[in-house]
């Protein structure tokens, strides 16, 4: 149960997850003040929410703490760490995102050590090695870490968890970790969103009078995938903030329905007024790609326990590589026409997450995670995946990122 008059701080305020947390906290009458941190201000906030432009990566903890003091960031009870910086290799991801968390926690301890109760960290299903290939299903929180000696690469989620373990040890504050997957949501000025990319793809297909083919492969289309709606993640993180049993624990947080793209894709097609063609996987395309992942599939860590033979490295197979599709002149021209007609961002194609969606849709293995751990502690909410996409598309229209019709 939420306590009255608590003070929260949220990092990554302009991202999908951070923005959703801020909105959810603002709806909680028990929350007195919300401090939000990002490098730039991309939204207008009500009086209850205080924005602070702070660079967590390039400023020392003592300098961040000084800014906190000067700007009235004090008496923090609950800290939500949703900041993230993309890098082009795993070592750099660990260094950069680890340092941001470390700097933030040290600054908090310098200014709010007497009042801080819990840090709520957002990581993801990459914890299970999902980015490396096929994993053991369903993914449950007691699954082992993927050793670096096995994968050949570090994992920044492990780095961040270890930082919180180290800093909270022997202190009055603790931590808890939420692990979503493929977040669907909206934040003003943020395009790190598969829903936005899907919308761009559908709108250009409509403009060109071309079919709305699933760009991945038939196996994944007919298989299963877990998505996390940002509103549900935020609601879950508020729940875990005050749940004593969540102390020093991590939890999967996905929509909780049984989701297959073979159900969702036709509904998205109907929403945008495009058609899924018959026999959509029967034709060979010049834009098709097939990549074998360089790391062993993490399911092989359980080879002996499961009594299975060695699983080969997983493949990413796309009948249409969106990275190649978006480079076509006809696609660029079509979006330019749409943008001029509807008064939209003419450069939207440049910020679509095409590479990410190639990986997402091209997977040849299922993505299924268990919510049992949270369910056993009383969290029962879920969200229909298509409803989450629909609400996201509707919000993208309101923000004039995509056409109204």
UniProtKB/Swiss-Prot annotation:
Protein name: Uncharacterized protein C757.02c
Domain of life where this protein originates: Eukaryota
A Pfam family of this chain: PRISE
GO molecular function per UniProt: oxidoreductase activity
Residue spans crossing the bilayer: none
PANTHER family: 3-OXO-DELTA(4,5)-STEROID 5-BETA-REDUCTASE
């Amino acid at each position: 149960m939420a306590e009255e008059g608590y003070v929260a701080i949220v990092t990554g305020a302009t991202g999908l997850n951070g923005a959703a947390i801020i909105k959810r906290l603002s709806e909680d009458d028990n929350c007195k003040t919300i401090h939000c941190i990002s490098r730039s201000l991309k939204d207008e906030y009500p009086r209850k929410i205080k924005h602070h432009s702070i660079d967590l990566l390039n400023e020392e903890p003592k300098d961040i703490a000084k800014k906190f003091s000067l700007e009235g960031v004090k008496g923090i009870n609950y800290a939500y760490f949703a900041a993230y910086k993309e890098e082009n290799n795993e070592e750099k991801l660990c260094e950069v995102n680890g340092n941001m968390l470390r700097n933030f926690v040290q600054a908090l301890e310098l200014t709010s050590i007497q009042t801080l109760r819990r840090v709520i960290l957002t990581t993801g299903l990459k914890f299970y090695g999902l980015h490396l290939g096929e994993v053991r299903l369903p993914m449950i929180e007691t699954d082992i870490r993927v050793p670096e000696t096995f994968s050949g690469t570090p994992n920044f989620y492990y780095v961040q968890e270890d930082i919180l373990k180290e800093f909270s040890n022997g202190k009055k504050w603790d931590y808890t970790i939420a692990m979503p997957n493929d977040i669907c949501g909206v934040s003003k000025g943020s395009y790190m969103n598969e829903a936005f990319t899907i919308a761009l793809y559908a709108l250009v297909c409509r403009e060109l009078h071309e079919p709305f083919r699933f760009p991945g492969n038939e196996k994944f289309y007919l298989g299963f995938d877990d998505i996390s709606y940002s509103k549900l993640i935020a609601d879950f993180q508020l729940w875990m903030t005050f749940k004593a049993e969540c102390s020093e624990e991590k939890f999967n947080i996905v929509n909780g329905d049984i989701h297959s793209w073979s159900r969702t894709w036709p509904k998205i097609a109907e929403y945008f007024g495009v058609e899924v063609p018959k026999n959509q996987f029967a034709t060979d395309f010049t834009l098709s790609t097939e990549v074998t992942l360089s790391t062993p599939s993490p399911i092989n860590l359980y080879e002996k326990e499961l009594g299975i033979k060695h699983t080969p490295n997983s493949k990413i197979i796309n009948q249409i590589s969106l990275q190649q599709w978006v480079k076509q002149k006809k696609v660029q021209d079509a979006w330019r026409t749409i943008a001029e007609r509807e008064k939209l961002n003419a450069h939207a194609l440049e910020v679509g997450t095409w590479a990410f969606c190639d990986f997402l849709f091209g997977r040849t293995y299922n993505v299924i995670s268990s919510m049992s751990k949270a369910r056993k502690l009383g969290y029962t909410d879920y969200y229909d995946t298509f409803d989450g996409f629909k609400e996201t598309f509707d919000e993208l229209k309101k923000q004039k990122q995509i056409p109204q019709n």
